């Protein structure tokens, strides 16, 4: 493999890895919730986890469908509707979540050497594909953080930590360095 191909593969692997890490982390938070918890709003200006998931799924479908060949803001996306609360079953929420991620990973798996430097557009704004992808990593990380914050708030003392629990950093570091 050539150096550019190696770099392309390494960058793409790192980006896909980050998307996967955020997906898994959010799912570990979602798994802790009761059905009704998906609709809790911390205040009247905050979104529920359901709305965040619906928004992320809509964004993923729009951004990743025909990623290299069409604007990332599809004409049939109604973004404002993503922020409307509805009562839907947990299974439907998780299906939206999974379909959004499937669209994301499918688009990323189709990228080939040289594609990261191609120009794509989002809302008419041109950028390199790698810029658009890193923008999405940041966007999804933001919303995954919101999901975790809300879930942690809901669960209170029953929250199961998704990362190193408070007071466990030194033990964790010693264990990892001993591997």
Short names for language-model regions:
Residues 2-16, 84-86, 92:
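Short, charged, low-complexity loops and linkers
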Residues 9, 21-25, 107:
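Small beta-barrel nucleic-acid-binding modules, principally OB-folds
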Residues 2, 16-23, 27, 35-81, ...:
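Short, contiguous alpha-helical
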Residues 33-36, 111:
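Short, solvent-exposed, charged loop/turn and helix-capping segments
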Residues 84-120, 127-141, 146:
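Acidic/histidine-rich alpha-helical segments that form the ligand environment
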